[in-house]
């Protein structure tokens, strides 16, 4: 079997990933033939977005196992898994996908067609992601009124998944149901995923979109120009605390102050049942150059100190609901998240 979407393409021997660093100006694919190359693509944000990272890692796992030469196959598998796992610490889908692949490995380690079984599992994961996103979209669209203006942050669209998207999936599904929707996309410094990726996706779909600077959101909310905020997630704790792109917490505080519903759209696989609250979620710190430079040009003084956390945590008291493929979760989050996980 093969896979071909805008975000990624699996040929059976390699994984091609749309280089999201070069969008919206250049549509170019990077071909990965080894698990190390997939790990590099994840680390360098050639591919990004929690669900997309997870599926890319699953295909990287397949490529790595195929490169096995001699010695203990289990030891080699653990090396491959570790190389992929240490790329980005916050997105739980990465570890969920690798653990799922490892489980299949141990269940079939003695089978002659082990590599084929692993490839089929990665493909199954990819196609499941598309269906999950469409279900998230359908569930979330019911919360969006006709004529709404939606504020979103970063990119939780088709580019952040195998296809369709989570937060943008909600917007897509609302539009597909006949609703008139307008979107304000935060530019999302420092990597500009909103300006570069979200705007690009929505324009291709013919959905009305405005790019705004991150610090405009409060002004727009106060003027009554935002009806709802819809964002994605990289990890959700058992109590509903949510890690997402840096700046999400600020939007949630502003939304709460202005009585605007704040929705998180994410697959159940983004919920980490081993973490009770957001205080336990590891936050990735990225290179200072992402802040001091923009478009390859330095915009800050030489030698200035920089903080560059890639994510922040929004506590559950600021979240109106979490939209998943299994349904919409409302407070009390810990109780209702446990119910969803049991479904």
Curated annotation (Swiss-Prot):
Catalysed reactions listed for this entry: 5-(methylsulfanyl)-alpha-D-ribose 1-phosphate = 5-(methylsulfanyl)-D-ribulose 1-phosphate
UniProt cross-references to SUPFAM superfamilies, sorted A to Z: NagB/RpiA/CoA transferase-like
Site positions per UniProt: Transition state stabilizer: 154
One of the Pfam families matching this protein, by short name: IF-2B
Positions annotated as active site in the UniProt record: 234 (proton donor)
GO biological process, one term: L-methionine salvage from methylthioadenosine
Key words, A-Z: Amino-acid biosynthesis, Isomerase, Methionine biosynthesis
InterPro entries in the record: IF-2B-related (IPR000649), IF-M1Pi (IPR005251), IF_2B-like_C (IPR042529), Initiation_fac_2B_a/b/d (IPR011559), M1Pi_N (IPR027363), NagB/RpiA_transferase-like (IPR037171)
Signal peptide as annotated in the record: none
Pathway(s) annotated for this protein in UniProt: Amino-acid biosynthesis; L-methionine biosynthesis via salvage pathway; L-methionine from S-methyl-5-thio-alpha-D-ribose 1-phosphate: step 1/6
Protein residues bound to substrate: 48-50, 88, 193, 244-245
EC number of the protein: 5.3.1.23
GO molecular function, one term: S-methyl-5-thioribose-1-phosphate isomerase activity
Enzyme class, broadest EC rank: isomerase
Tagged with keyword Calcium: no
NCBIfam families attached to this UniProt entry: eIF-2B_rel, PRK05720.1, salvage_mtnA
UniProt family annotation: Belongs to the eIF-2B alpha/beta/delta subunits family. MtnA subfamily.
Purpose of the protein: Catalyzes the interconversion of methylthioribose-1-phosphate (MTR-1-P) into methylthioribulose-1-phosphate (MTRu-1-P).
Stated name of the protein: Methylthioribose-1-phosphate isomerase
Source species of the chain: Thermotoga maritima (strain ATCC 43589 / DSM 3109 / JCM 10099 / NBRC 100826 / MSB8)
């Amino acid at each position: 079997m093969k896979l071909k979407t805008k975000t990624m393409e699996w040929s059976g021997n390699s994984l091609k990933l749309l280089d999201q660093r070069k969008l919206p100006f250049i549509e170019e694919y990077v071909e990965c033939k080894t698990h190390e190359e997939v790990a590099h693509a994840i680390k360098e944000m050639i591919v990004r977005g929690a669900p997309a990272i997870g599926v890319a890692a699953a295909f990287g796992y397949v490529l790595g196992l195929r490169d096995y030469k001699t010695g203990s196959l289990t030891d080699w598998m653990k090396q491959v898994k570790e190389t992929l796992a240490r790329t980005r610490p916050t997105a739980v889908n990465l570890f969920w996908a690798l653990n799922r692949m490892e489980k299949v490995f141990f269940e079939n380690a003695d089978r002659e067609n082990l590599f084929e079984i692993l490839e089929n599992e990665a493909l199954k994961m990819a196609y499941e992601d598309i269906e999950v996103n469409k279900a998230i979209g359908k569930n979330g669209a019911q919360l969006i009124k006709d004529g709404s203006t939606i504020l979103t942050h970063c990119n939780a669209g088709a580019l952040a998944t195998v296809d369709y998207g989570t937060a943008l999936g909600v917007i897509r599904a609302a539009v597909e149901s006949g609703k008139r929707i307008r979107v304000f996309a935060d530019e999302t410094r420092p990597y500009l995923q909103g300006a570069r990726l979200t705007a690009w996706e929505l324009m291709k779909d013919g959905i009305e979109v405005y790019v705004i600077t991150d610090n405009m959101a409060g002004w727009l909310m106060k003027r009554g120009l935002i009806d709802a905020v819809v964002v994605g997630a990289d990890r959700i704790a058992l109590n509903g605390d949510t890690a997402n792109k840096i700046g999400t917490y600020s939007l949630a505080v502003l939304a709460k102050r202005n009585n605007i519903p704040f929705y998180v759209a994410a697959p159940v696989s983004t919920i980490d049942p081993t973490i009770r609250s957001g205080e336990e979620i590891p936050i990735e710190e990225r290179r200072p150059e992402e802040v001091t430079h923009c478009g390859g040009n330095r915009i800050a003084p030489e030698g200035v100190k920089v903080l560059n956390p890639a994510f922040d945590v929004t506590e559950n008291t600021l979240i109106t609901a979490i939209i998943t493929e299994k349904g919409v979760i409302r407070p009390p989050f810990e109780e209702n998240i446990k119910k969803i996980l049991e479904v």
